[in-house]
Swiss-Prot record:
It catalyses: (2R)-2-phosphoglycerate = phosphoenolpyruvate + H2O. This is Enolase. The gene is eno. The active site is at 204 (proton donor), 349 (proton acceptor). Keywords: Cytoplasm, Glycolysis, Lyase, Magnesium, Metal-binding, Secreted. Its cofactor is Mg(2+). It is found in: Cytoplasm; Secreted; Cell surface. SMART domains: Enolase_C, Enolase_N. Its EC number is 4.2.1.11. GO terms for molecular function: magnesium ion binding; phosphopyruvate hydratase activity. Binds a second Mg(2+) ion via substrate during catalysis. Catalyzes the reversible conversion of 2-phosphoglycerate (2-PG) into phosphoenolpyruvate (PEP). It is essential for the degradation of carbohydrates via glycolysis. The lineage of its organism: Bacteria, Pseudomonadati, Chlorobiota, Chlorobiia, Chlorobiales.
Length: 437
């Protein structure tokens, strides 16, 4: 029987030592478990993560209220529902909460239930989750965005931009691309050590050295690619991209250094330089001409629509421009962006929106309008590997899930290795074809 008999939540710990929600869903013949991630730099338009705010316990970060909501309200309402009816389950969860941002029950409570139900449904159907969600066409392994060097809100250093990532695009198999990423990661570690810079890793497994400038940060990554025996591709030479093995992706997290009063982008961690929206867009255009950059996420602040438009006009034809804080996995905000012609890609974080159904709707809307989707982790993660399954299920072609260290990140990469093995000769690794620029 596929009828839900019990839903139980508990408080567990995430990769940063903060509490998060884990949910178990039972039917008479199947079981599903999901753990919920949490972000450090969060967009103001995200669904609400319910915290206890009792400063005497876990510094206010406890999630017992969300756990109680699952064990009482949600458990009672969903018992007797068919676990394979995902859309009905998610609609019921939205009805129970009754708010647009899930502030009553908490997006962390709702998401845990939604994902655990999907896993229980997959087990009941005797299918891997990627096949259960995506059907027989699910066969594309994603190109990894590997966060190897950190700054911004993710590091105590002099780098303004949050993430410098490598994307191994010049390969035919996911497993070979993963090997490349690991080799570049270790080459970067050796390079930093040789320069007397820190090799300690941050929340997502990337290094956070105290380098002299934003430029030095990206140049270190490019040098490490060469030291590993690979070639960095050039973003403007479309015909020659196949000659390169690795390209650079950036997540500046520009909302974090945007001064809303001055309406300026302030490089407060490095030079103190202040740039207007037009100057910031020109700054990225200059970087895209000088460095092998294939993707920039949140190159402009989340509500700087004019700046986003300028950036898209300048480099949107040759660089993937990903909206994270801008779109927050929300179909309504993505629709607004499509109408205004800003960006050409959306970052997909399941906890930004709160249900699997809404996540899949955002991916579908992006696909129908020529936008790419990048399935993403959060800085606070667990051993849960659902996002790896979603990446393959939707044939998204790209995944952002940290560096080549920390088991909370490696769990996703390893799950993708298992899926590649399971798919065998039908597995597709898109490489540069994952991009539409």
């Amino acid at each position: 029987m596929s009828v839900i008999t019990k839903i139980h939540a508990r408080q567990i710990m995430d990769s940063r030592g903060n509490p998060t929600v884990e949910v178990d869903v039972y039917t008479e013949s199947s079981f599903g478990r999901a753990a919920v991630p949490s972000g450090a730099s969060t967009g103001v338009h995200e669904a609400v993560e319910l915290r206890d705010n009792d400063k005497s316990v876990f510094l206010g970060k406890g999630v017992l209220k969300a756990v109680e909501n699952v064990n009482t309200v949600i458990n009672s309402a969903l018992q007797g529902m068919d676990v394979t009816e995902q859309e009905e389950i998610d609609a019921k969860l939205l009805e129970l909460d009754g708010t647009p941002n899930k502030s009553v029950l908490g997006a962390n409570a709702i998401l845990g239930v939604s994902l655990a139900c999907a896993k229980a449904g997959a087990e009941y159907s005797a299918l891997p989750l990627y096949r259960y969600i995506g059907g027989t066409t699910a066969k594309t392994l994603p190109v990894p965005m590997m966060n190897v060097l950190n700054g911004g809100a993710h590091a105590d250093n002099t780098v303004d931009f949050q993430e410098f990532m490598i994307m191994p695009i010049g390969f035919e198999r996911y497993s070979d691309a993963l090997r490349c990423g690991a080799e570049v990661f270790h080459s970067l570690k050796a390079l930093l050590h040789k320069r007397g810079l820190s090799t300690a890793v941050g929340d997502e497994g990337g290094f956070a050295p105290n380098v002299e400038s934003n430029e030095q940060a990206i140049e270190l990554v490019i040098e490490a690619i060469g030291l590993a025996g690979y070639k960095a591709g050039a973003p403007t030479d479309k015909g020659g991209l196949g000659d390169g093995h690795v390209m650079i992706a950036l997540d500046p997290a520009s909302s974090e250094f945007y001064d809303t009063e001055k309406k300026k982008y302030v490089f407060k961690k490095s030079s103190g330089r202040e740039l207007s929206s037009e100057e910031m867009a020109s700054y990225w255009a200059d970087w895209a001409s000088r460095y092998p950059i294939i993707s920039i996420e949140d190159g402009m602040a989340e509500d700087d629509w004019e700046g986003w438009k300028l950036l898209t006009e300048k480099i949107g034809d040759r660089v993937q421009l990903v909206g994270d804080d801008l779109f927050v996995t929300n179909s309504k905000r993505l629709g607004e962006g499509i109408e205004k012609g800003v960006g050409n890609s959306i970052l997909i974080k399941v906890n930004q929106i709160g249900t699997l159904t809404e996540t899949l709707q955002a991916i579908d809307l992006a696909k129908r309008n020529g936008y790419t989707s990048v399935i993403s982790h959060r800085s606070g993660e667990t051993e849960d590997t659902t996002i790896a399954q979603i990446a393959v299920a939707t044939n998204a072609g790209q995944i952002k899930t940290g560096s080549m260290s920390r088991s909370d990140r490696m769990a996703k990469y390893n799950e993708l290795l298992r899926i590649e093995e399971m798919l065998g000769d039908t597995a597709v690794y898109p490489g540069i074809k994952a991009f539409r620029v």
